[in-house]
Amino acid sequence: MSSYANHQALAGLTLGKSTDYRDTYDASLLQGVPRSLNRDPLGLKADNLPFHGTDIWTLYELSWLNAKGLPQVAVGHVELEYTSVNLIESKSFKLYLNSFNQTRFNNWDEVRQTLERDLSTCAQGKVSVALYRLDELEGQPIGHFNGTCIDDQDITIDNYEFTTDYLENATSGEKVVEETLVSHLLKSNCLITHQPDWGSIQIQYRGRQIDREKLLRYLVSFRHHNEFHEQCVERIFNDLLRFCQPEKLSVYARYTRRGGLDINPWRSNSDFVPSTTRLVRQ
């Protein structure tokens, strides 16, 4: 369990509690979680972070009424900057989106601007929002992570408790390699409810070669670990940077959706550009 699981900053969250579902607009439903809760124990300081990146959200259950009362539906794409003070707590995001359901807006741009304003206020950081009509996305192919999948290894695993021990001496040789490794076996658990979070992860790096068995064992050790998606990605980035010391590193995870939302955080210290196409489990 994370050291800050019972932190007072989490006490007021609706996550894990019985809640009422409102269908008229209410920005106060949004709740933020300080990024510092995870970053402080990792020694990460807001003014000297070793990465950049965003939290990419896809909104699949977004609906409101137009000025004449006709329901509208859209798929939303949200990007929250890594520099924001808070991350957005996902259940509160779902409840907030539900509050649009019986609310009239004059046009689509008013909806987009409202989302952008409220999310920016909650996160205390930069947020961008794009809305897509369904016919704009119909026929969009299922994406995949480019890279070499490390999952099909004939190894025995009997420990599922998080540890960085597997990354000790995980690099070999002096030759510098540049490769992209992929695993679909990432599974962690919600910090509050301990419900499972399922994801695929892409690790792109340049440096001494990382032992794939040790890397896979490390990733599997998240199986009983309780943290939010964004926190897991930053922990993985920080651990790889610390133990493997690559010249360049990018870590990108795409998680399956829950409550009509999926969260896809990435962190990088290079010119990494994430693919935003949904994966087969999304």
UniProtKB/Swiss-Prot annotation:
UniProt-listed InterPro entries: GTP-CH-I_C/QueF (IPR043133), NADPH_dep_7-cyano-7-deazaG_red (IPR050084), QueF (IPR029500), QueF_N (IPR029139), QueF_type2 (IPR016428)
Binding site for NADPH: S90, K91, R258, G259
Subcellular location per the Swiss-Prot or TrEMBL entry: Cytoplasm
GO molecular function, one term: preQ1 synthase activity
Catalysed reactions, semicolon-separated: 7-aminomethyl-7-carbaguanine + 2 NADP(+) = 7-cyano-7-deazaguanine + 2 NADPH + 3 H(+)
Keyword terms: Cytoplasm, NADP, Oxidoreductase, Queuosine biosynthesis
Pathway: tRNA modification; tRNA-queuosine biosynthesis
EC number: 1.7.1.13
Active site per database record: C190, D197
Gene Ontology annotations of biological process type: queuosine biosynthetic process; tRNA modification
Cellular component terms per the entry's GO annotation: cytoplasm
Entry superkingdom: Bacteria
The keyword Ion transport is assigned to this record: no
Positions with a binding annotation for substrate: I88, E89, S90, H229, E230
The keyword Oxidoreductase is assigned to this record: yes
First-tier enzyme category under EC: oxidoreductase
Similarity field: Belongs to the GTP cyclohydrolase I family. QueF type 2 subfamily.
Role according to the record: Catalyzes the NADPH-dependent reduction of 7-cyano-7-deazaguanine (preQ0) to 7-aminomethyl-7-deazaguanine (preQ1).
Oligomer status and interactors: Homodimer.
HAMAP family named in the record: QueF_type2
Protein's recorded name: NADPH-dependent 7-cyano-7-deazaguanine reductase
Organism: Escherichia coli O45:K1 (strain S88 / ExPEC)
Organism phylogeny: Bacteria, Pseudomonadati, Pseudomonadota, Gammaproteobacteria, Enterobacterales
